C-alpha cells in the first residue's frame, strides 16, 4: 500500500537531529561514499549533499600539494574539473549521482606528480531503489512529486524524498514515519527557497540491507505545468466570432513572448472535426463564424515556447451569436421617454410664447375714420373716389 505526504521546510534546528538519525545502523537514507583505497594518504571523503570532496591536510605523505579535482560519470555524462580551495574541492554545479561517480585528485608529493582516486557508488541491490521519479509545479504554488517502488525492493522498504536548491539547502522533505505505509508521492506547498535548478533525490531504508537511491537535477522552469488561461470570453455576430483570454498565473517569471496559445472550437455534433489555431504573443483571436450558427464551443490552452509543452485546457465556452434585436421592454421605455421629452419641449415652447406675448404685446394699428367705419360701403366709397 502506498500513501502521499505533504512536504514542509525543515527548520535548521531539526536538521542536525535528522542527520544523526539517518546515520543510525541499518539505514541507508544518507548517501555514503565508498573508496577502494582505504589506505589513501589523503583520506579522501565525498559529501554528496554539498558536492564537496575533502582530504586530510596533515597527511603522513609529506609535502602534498593538490592542483585539481575531477568528477566523472560516463553513464550520466559528467566530466568536471575544479581547483582546490584549502583542503577541499567543491563542485559548484549540481549533478545526478545514482549512476556512481569517480573522483580524481591530481597533485604533487615532494615535487613529484601524484594521483589519488575515490569511487562513489550507489550501494544496494539492483531494483531496490525507487524508479520513474517525476515532479511538477502546479497552480503556480506547489510542487508535486511521484515515483514507483522498485521491482526488487524489500518488503519493509521506506522511501524518503528530498528537494534541495543549488546551494544545498533543503527546499522540502518528505519522510514516512515509523510504522507508516510506503510512500510514493509528496507535495511541497512552500517553494520560497526554490531557485532556477533543483536537486531531487529519493532514498530508501530497509532492515534487509542498503537500498539504492534515485536522484536527478532539473531546471525548475521545466517542471512547471501551466494552468488554463484566465478570463476566457467568447462572442459572435453574423459574420465573425471573437475569443479573448488572459495568460495563466505562473510560478516562474514569464513574459508575453514566452507564451503561446492554442484555440480550439468544435461543433457539439458527434464525429465533428475540431478546428485549431496557434496564437503567439496575442491574447485575442477573431475568426469567421462557424456554420451552422450555434452549437459550437471553444476552449483555450497555454504553452511555454521554450519548454515545448502545453498546459491544461480552459472550460469550453459556447459560441453564440449576439442577439441584435431590441428587447420589447427597452423599446417601450425609449418610446415613453421620447413622448415625455416631446411633451416637455412643447410645454416649454408654449410657455415661452405666452411669456413673450405678455412682455411684448402687439402694437395697435392706425385706424382710418372713413375706411374703417363699418357703416361705409366699400364699393360706394371707391366710386366716390374715382369721380372727377
Curated annotation (Swiss-Prot):
Residues 228-324 form the Fibronectin type-III domain. Residues 1-29 form the signal peptide. One of its GO terms (molecular function) is granulocyte colony-stimulating factor binding. It is found in: Membrane. GO terms for biological process: cellular response to granulocyte macrophage colony-stimulating factor stimulus. GO terms for cellular component: membrane; plasma membrane. Glycans are attached at residues 43, 63, 106, 132, 165, 237. Pfam families: IL3Ra_N, IL6Ra-bind. Residues 349-388 are cytoplasmic. A motif (WSXWS motif) lies at residues 310-314. Keywords: Glycoprotein, Membrane, Receptor, Signal, Transmembrane, Transmembrane helix. It is a single-pass type I membrane protein. CDD domains: FN3 (cd00063). Its main location: membrane. The chain crosses the membrane at residues 328-348. A motif (Box 1 motif) lies at residues 359-367. It comes from the Eukaryota. InterPro entries: FN3_dom, FN3_sf, Ig-like_fold, IL3Ra_N, Short_hematopoietin_rcpt_2_CS, TypeI_recpt_CBD. Residues 30-327 are extracellular. Low affinity receptor for granulocyte-macrophage colony-stimulating factor. Transduces a signal that results in the proliferation, differentiation, and functional activation of hematopoietic cells. Belongs to the type I cytokine receptor family. Type 5 subfamily. The WSXWS motif appears to be necessary for proper protein folding and thereby efficient intracellular transport and cell-surface receptor binding. The box 1 motif is required for JAK interaction and/or activation. Heterodimer of an alpha and a beta subunit. The beta subunit is common to the IL3, IL5 and GM-CSF receptors. The signaling GM-CSF receptor complex is a dodecamer of two head-to-head hexamers of two alpha, two beta, and two ligand subunits. This is Granulocyte-macrophage colony-stimulating factor receptor subunit alpha.
Amino acid at each position: 500500500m502506498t500513501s502521499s505526504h505533504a512536504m514542509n521546510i525543515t527548520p535548521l534546528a531539526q536538521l542536525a537531529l535528522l542527520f544523526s538519525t539517518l546515520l543510525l545502523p541499518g539505514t541507508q537514507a544518507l548517501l555514503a561514499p565508498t573508496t577502494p583505497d582505504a589506505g589513501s594518504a589523503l583520506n579522501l571523503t565525498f559529501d554528496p549533499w554539498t558536492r564537496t570532496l575533502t582530504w586530510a591536510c596533515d597527511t603522513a605523505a609529506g609535502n602534498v600539494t593538490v592542483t585539481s579535482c575531477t568528477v566523472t560519470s560516463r553513464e550520466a555524462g559528467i566530466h568536471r574539473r575544479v581547483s582546490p580551495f584549502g583542503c577541499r574541492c567543491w563542485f559548484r554545479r549540481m549533478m545526478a549521482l545514482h549512476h556512481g561517480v569517480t573522483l580524481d585528485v591530481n597533485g604533487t608529493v615532494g615535487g613529484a606528480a601524484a594521483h589519488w582516486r575515490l569511487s562513489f557508488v550507489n550501494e544496494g541491490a539492483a531494483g531496490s531503489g525507487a524508479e520513474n521519479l517525476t515532479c511538477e509545479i502546479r497552480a503556480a504554488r506547489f510542487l508535486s512529486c511521484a515515483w514507483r517502488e522498485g521491482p526488487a525492493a524489500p518488503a519493509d522498504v521506506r522511501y524518503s524524498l528530498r528537494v534541495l536548491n543549488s546551494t544545498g539547502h533543503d527546499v522540502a522533505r518528505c519522510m514516512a514515519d515509523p510504522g507508516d505505509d510506503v510512500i510514493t508521492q509528496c507535495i511541497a506547498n512552500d517553494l520560497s527557497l526554490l531557485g532556477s535548478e533543483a536537486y531531487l533525490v529519493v532514498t530508501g531504508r530497509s532492515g534487509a540491507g542498503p537500498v539504492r537511491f534515485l536522484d536527478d537535477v532539473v531546471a525548475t522552469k521545466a517542471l512547471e505545468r501551466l494552468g488554463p488561461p484566465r478570463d476566457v470570453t467568447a462572442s459572435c455576430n453574423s459574420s465573425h466570432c471573437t475569443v479573448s483570454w488572459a495568460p495563466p498565473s505562473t510560478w516562474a517569471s514569464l513574459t508575453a513572448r514566452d507564451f503561446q496559445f492554442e484555440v480550439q472550437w468544435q461543433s457539439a455534433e458527434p464525429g465533428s472535426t475540431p478546428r485549431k489555431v496557434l496564437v503567439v504573443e496575442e491574447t485575442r483571436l477573431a475568426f469567421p463564424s462557424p456554420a451552422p450558427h450555434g452549437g459550437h464551443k471553444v476552449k483555450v490552452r497555454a504553452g511555454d515556447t521554450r519548454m515545448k509543452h502545453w498546459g491544461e485546457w480552459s472550460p469550453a465556452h459556447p459560441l453564440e451569436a449576439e442577439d441584435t434585436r431590441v428587447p420589447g421592454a427597452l423599446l417601450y421605455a425609449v418610446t415613453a421617454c421620447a413622448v415625455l421629452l416631446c411633451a416637455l419641449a412643447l410645454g416649454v415652447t408654449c410657455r415661452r410664447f405666452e411669456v413673450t406675448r405678455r412682455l411684448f404685446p402687439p402694437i395697435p394699428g392706425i385706424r382710418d375714420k372713413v375706411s374703417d367705419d363699418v357703416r361705409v360701403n366699400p364699393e360706394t366709397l371707391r366710386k366716390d373716389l374715382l369721380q372727377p
